[in-house]
């Protein structure tokens, strides 16, 4: 929830989701 994963999720899900990242405010965050 606090560390950006250098990925946006405006149109598509987070590919980094497999690494523990989740979508928040159109940006992928880790924890």
From Swiss-Prot:
GO BP of this protein: defense response
The keyword Transport is annotated on this UniProt entry: no
Pfam families hit by this protein: Cyclotide (PF03784)
Free-text description of this protein's post-translational modifications in UniProt: This is a cyclic peptide.
Record location of the Cyclopeptide (Gly-Asn) cross-link: 1-31
Entry keywords, A to Z: Disulfide bond, Knottin, Plant defense
Record InterPro entries: Cyclotide (IPR005535), Cyclotide_bracelet_CS (IPR012323), Cyclotide_sf (IPR036146)
Disulfide bridge partners, by residue number: 5-21, 9-23, 14-28
Protein's job: Probably participates in a plant defense mechanism.
Domain note: The presence of a 'disulfide through disulfide knot' structurally defines this protein as a knottin.
Record-stated family: Belongs to the cyclotide family. Bracelet subfamily.
Protein name, entry field: Cyclotide vico-A
Organism, as annotated: Viola cotyledon (Violeta)
Organismal lineage: Eukaryota, Viridiplantae, Streptophyta, Embryophyta, Tracheophyta
């Amino acid at each position: 929830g606090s560390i950006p994963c250098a990925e946006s999720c405006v149109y598509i899900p987070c590919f980094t989701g497999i690494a523990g990242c989740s979508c928040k405010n159109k940006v992928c965050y880790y924890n």
